[in-house]
Amino acid sequence: AFHLVPRAYALCTTGLENYTAALGIGKFITSITMTVFYILLYYVWRNRYKIEGKKEITIAVYLMAALRIILCLFPQNAWTRADAPLSWGIYRNIPFAILGLIVIVLFCRSAKEHKDRDFRWMWLTIVLSFGFYIPVVLWADTVPAVGMLMIPKTCAYVWTVMIGYQ
C-alpha cells in the first residue's frame, strides 16, 4: 500500500509526475518490507515442513535479502526523482528475484513431496506476484499504466497470506 495508494491517487488526479517523491518513498519502503516478507515466507516453509538444518539455504536467503536491502540504500536509486535510473531498479531486483526463486522452489518441492493440499498453490502465488511485478520494474516509467499491475500483484500476495493462515 505504500506505493499503491499514491499511484492510484496520482492516476485519478493530476498525474504521476506530481507525486514522484511520494511514489519513490513508497517504493523504497515496499522494497524493504517485501524483502522481510520473503524471509518470513522462508520460515513459514521451515515450520510447515519441520525443516531442520539446511544451513546453506538459510545463508542464501539472508545473503540475498541483505544484498537487496544494501542495494536499496544506495543513493543511485534516486527514489524521489522522476528520472530514477532503470539500471538500479534492475540491480536491486536481481537478489530479490533470486530470493523469490528460492522460496518458489522450496514450496513447490515440499508441497509435492508432502502431498500438501493446503499449500499446493503457494509457489504459484509467488510466481504470479513476480509475473506482475517484473513489467512494472521494467516499463512503468515509460508506460505509466503498467504500474496498475501492482494491483493484481497485491492480490497474489493476499492469496499467499490466505494460504499461510489456513
Which residue stretches match the model-derived regions?
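Internal transmembrane alpha-helix with an interfacial aromatic "cap," most often the third helix
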Residues: 2-21, 25-59, 70-77, 104-107, ...
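C-terminal ends of transmembrane alpha-helices
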Residues: 2-13, 65-84, 127-146
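Lipid-exposed faces of alpha-helical membrane segments in multi-pass integral membrane proteins
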Residues: 2-5, 29, 33-36, 60-70, ...
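Non-cytosolic membrane-interface motifs at loop->transmembrane helix junctions
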Residues: 16-27, 81-94, 143-153
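Alpha-helical transmembrane segments in multipass membrane proteins, preferentially the mid-helix core
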Residues: 40-44, 70-77, 94-120, 132-139, ...
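Secondary-structure boundary elements
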Residues: 47-52, 113, 128-131
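Membrane-helix interface segments
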Residues: 52-56, 117-118, 144-145
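A loop-to-helix transmembrane entry motif
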Residues: 58-64, 82-100, 116-123, 150
